[in-house]
Design a protein with these regions (language model features):
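N-terminal amphipathic/basic-hydrophobic helices that include classical n-h-c signal peptides
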Residues: 1-21, 145
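Short, mixed charged/polar active-site loops
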Residues: 112, 157, 537-538, 564
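Helicase motor core with emphasis on the C-terminal RecA-like subdomain
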Residues: 39-79, 83-86, 90, 95-190, ...
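N-terminal accessory nucleic-acid engagement/regulatory domains that precede
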Residues: 12-67, 747-749
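A detector of low-complexity, intrinsically disordered, Ser/Thr/Gly/Pro/Ala-rich segments
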Residues: 8-10, 29, 378
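Generic alpha-helix initiation/capping and coil-helix boundary signal
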Residues: 2-6, 84, 462, 762, ...
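Extended, highly charged accessory segments
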Residues: 245-248, 427, 469, 476-552, ...
């Protein structure tokens, strides 16, 4: 049975519940977003596939706890807080009972007080310390600002400090000695605190609480690393004779209790019922209009998001637009600035917010939004988390963010001050987007996704046992996680970094292992963007390693606050991109290819005339060039070459293949089979993402040979093109062995557990893929089923849609 929507009130489809423009006066600011929803429903009825409403919800309250320190009660009263929400009172009771706790309530429901009250109370009465961990610096700085406000209101004297990479060296000792609450992030704990725990002895000896917020963001490889960092933290705490309590918080996910327990390795109590009041929320599912019925092509989500944001801002509503990439943030920001910021005598009303900007720029955007000086903000998932940007009226999603949980997290940014709000999901041509807006019932009924981590993934675990051995010697029989660490210690001893003697394993190497372990990326090191305009050399942005190949190649247009910079030189080894400001009427988009090779088969099964498999694969991703795309018209005006190192990873995958004899019987040519398998891969990826409720970015697809000799991609016409391992075009007709294979693979090193359940359901996935194609109303294939195509003049039995159906039929039971 599906879990309810991320509010305690159930979400229901209300075909006539949204107010018409005349139902309520637009002059009343409390109903502006509702009135806009009504106007949109009337004016754009043909584009709205789903209309839902969450009614306003009354708050449930509890008095301040009797055992709350009087000074803290006075501080709360000074800030206008004279009672608690019910979940805050429940959290106080649970923490006071000694339980480890996870609080899972909607955005803006007051989760912060769930841990602030016990932490400050303990600091006031027992001089106890607390460590806060947040996934981003912005959240950490928000939290310190909140604690300082509470301190100021009650003259409490509790000392709270951030400890991150920006903390000056001369301030670090004072923080270690005098901080009651130290607010940091997993990376700093991993690299700067645990390896130097002896400098933190006084802090650790008095550590009472460990607060881990936004735990839904700790999933996949990052979450698996963080779980091991917490294992190391508890090991150091035990050395200092303390066993701190955990207080964890999360946005709505499908498995909060299980996920929290996997992170900390201990049982937790879960609080999932929110007592916070909520304003009326309206949700629209928006499918752009069809512009080419034959090909099933629709207007771009970008143009529709731009239109919706313009309408909302012109109506005086504070609006946030979420884009799926940094590039799209800049493109949408430019479009909105062209409308609203054209008058140089008036202050800018539109801002961009994304990773890669300098911290000062992001903090300024946050302050301006809170103060009401910005009418429209365009951001990436960086704004999903709880950064305070004040009250918003409208949230527009430029494309489905990849998960139900992330969708509600983003919609939750509006209506944070209990006013009515509007959220609009604008579907892109991505098949997953189309699947959702065409079946709005799925969106209502779907449970939020499960967060998956694998703390015992061998490479990750070995990395952290190495770090833990540097921090403290291991004793014979000592576990790390649920198992004895001895086999891992023996491996490290063989490499010469550990020495075992007398039941004790000591670190003997000169290296500093934490520096060699990245929690967030396959490889270490962000790239800095250096502006050389006018002969200067100024660092203006940072780009993480995984995005550098797609955004910082030579010739790329790299946009910052919608200002275009051209990349003149990329120093890959030095992690620097040199840019100059430019004036062009286009942006650039990378062209990349993926090839795979099977390393090991874990399991296999018959799948119709073919077979399905689960195993380990080697993935190589190559950026081969880029396209120049003109603003507004979106026409492709040219190409450029890219020469960069290949990006490689080992991961797990599920794959399907059909023997050559069966292919030759089903298809008139190898080219037809290649087209069919590319369409099948597109469709299988869509239904697989939904089946395991994964985020689209966690699961990738590819088509290649069973032996890794070639790979395939769709050309500009949407037809299959075979390429050899050096990336050169090839002809499938000349191959001695032709066994096209569809791969769905975990997008993280070692995998995050997606491929195994997909293999278990391989037959079901093929049936769902066939049903998706059958339900699609296009004639020849389209982005919603088999992928985009540019020509559809073939006979019906030779269209990409028909060929994909034929390929999938070979994989069904005979």
């Amino acid at each position: 049975m599906a879990a309810p929507a991320p509010e305690s009130a159930a979400m229901t489809a209300l075909p006539h519940a949204l107010p018409s423009p005349d139902d309520r006066p637009a002059a009343d600011p409390r109903t502006d977003s509702a009135a806009l929803a009504g106007r949109l429903c009337v004016r754009y009825a043909d584009r709205i596939t789903g209309r839902f409403s969450l009614p306003a919800r009354e708050g449930r309250y509890a008095p301040l706890p009797e055992d709350l320190p009087p000074a803290l009660a006075r501080a709360l009263a000074a800030r206008g807080i004279e009672r608690l929400y019910s979940h805050q009172a429940d959290a106080w009771s649970a923490v006071r009972s000694g339980a480890d706790l996870v609080v899972v309530t909607p955005t803006a429901s007051g989760k912060t007080l769930c841990y602030t009250l016990p932490v400050v109370a303990a600091a006031l009465t027992r001089q106890a310390k607390a460590l806060y961990l947040f996934p981003t610096k912005a959240l950490a700085q928000d939290q310190v600002a909140e604690l300082l406000e509470l301190n100021k209101a009650g003259a409490l004297g509790v000392k709270a400090f951030t400890f991150d990479g920006d903390t000056p060296g001369d301030a670090r000792q004072a923080i270690r000695l005098h901080g009651d609450v130290v607010v940091s992030n997993p990376d700093m704990l991993h690299q700067a605190i645990l390896p130097h725990h002896t400098k933190w002895a006084q802090f650790f000896e008095n550590l009472k609480y460990i607060v881990v917020d936004e735990i839904h963001s700790y999933r996949g490889v990052f979450g698996s690393h963080v779980a091991n960092v917490l294992r190391r933290l508890l090991r150091v705490c035990a050395f200092y004779g303390v066993n701190p309590q955990f207080i964890l918080c999360s946005a709505t996910i499908g498995n909060p209790k299980d996920h929290a327990e996997a992170l900390i390795g201990r049982p937790v109590r879960a609080i999932t019922e929110s007592g916070a009041p909520s304003g009326e929320k309206h949700v629209l599912l928006w499918n752009p209009p069809v512009v080419n019925p034959d090909l099933g092509l629709r207007a771009s989500a970008r143009s529709q998001s731009n239109r919706l944001a313009r309408l909302a801002i012109k109506a005086g509503l504070k609006t946030l637009v979420f884009a799926q990439s940094r590039l799209m943030v800049e493109v949408l920001t430019k479009y909105l600035k062209d409308v609203f910021d054209h008058d140089p005598r008036k202050p800018a009303r539109i801002r961009a917010y994304r990773g890669g900007y300098l911290p000062t720029e992001r903090r300024e955007a946050e302050r301006d939004m809170r103060a009401g000086r910005i009418d429209g903000l365009v951001g990436t998932s960086a704004l999903e988390l709880g950064v305070d940007i004040g009250g918003l009226d409208v949230v527009v999603l430029n494309g489905y963010p990849g998960s139900v949980a992330a969708t509600w997290q983003r919609f939750g940014r509006a209506g944070r001050r209990q006013q009515p709000s509007l959220g609009v999901l604008v579907a892109s041509s991505d098949p997953l987007d189309q699947y959702l807006v065409r079946q709005p019932g799925f969106f209502i009924d779907a449970s939020p996704e499960h967060a998956r981590i694998h703390p015992d993934q061998p490479l990750i675990r070995l990395d952290h046992i190495r770090c833990a051995a540097f921090e403290l010697p291991f004793l014979a029989g000592e576990p790390f996680g649920s198992d004895d660490a001895a086999p891992w210690l023996e491996v490290l001893a063989e490499t010469g970094v550990l020495h075992g003697e007398g039941g004790r394993w000591e670190w003997i190497a000169d290296s500093y292992p934490a520096n060699a372990v990245s929690l967030r990326a396959v490889a270490d090191g962000n790239f800095v963007v250096v502006d050389r305009t006018d002969g200067r050399q100024t660092i203006i942005a940072e780009v993480d390693y995984s995005a550098a190949a797609l955004t910082l190649y030579e010739g790329a247009i790299h946009m910052i606050q919608s200002t275009p910079y051209q990349v003149e030189r990329l120093d890959w080894d030095g992690r620097k991109a040199y840019v100059t400001r430019t004036h062009v009427d286009y942006y650039t988009d990378a062209i990349d290819y993926t090839r795979l090779k099977v390393l090991d088969r874990f399991d296999g099964a018959i799948a119709g005339s073919g077979s399905a498999h689960h195993g380990e694969v080697h993935v190589v991703r190559r950026v081969a060039g880029y396209k120049k795309i003109r603003y507004y018209s979106h026409e492709n005006i040219g190409y450029g070459p890219v020469t960069l190192p290949d990006q490689e990873l080992h991961t797990t995958a599920v794959w399907w293949q059909v023997p050559q004899a069966a292919l030759e019987a089903a298809f008139e040519s190898r080219q037809a089979a290649l087209d069919g398998f590319l369409g099948a891969a597109h469709t299988l990826h869509t239904v697989a993402t939904v089946a395991v409720m994964a985020e689209a970015r966690d699961l990738h697809k590819a088509v290649g040979s069973g032996d890794g000799a070639w790979f395939a991609h769709a050309d500009g016409r949407g037809r299959g093109q075979l390429r050899s391992l050096d990336g050169q075009p090839g002809d499938p007709a000349v191959l001695a062995r032709f066994v096209p294979t569809v791969y769905l693979y975990d997008a993280y090193p070692g995998g995050v557990g997606l491929s195994e359940p997909l293999f278990t359901r391989h037959a079901e996935l093929v049936q769902h893929a066939l049903a998706l194609i059958a339900r699609c109303d296009c004639r020849a294939g389209c982005p919603a089923c088999t992928g985009p195509i540019l020509a559809a003049d073939e006979a019906a039995e030779r269209t990409p849609k028909s060929l994909a159906e034929r390929a999938l039929s070979l994989l069904t039971a005979v």
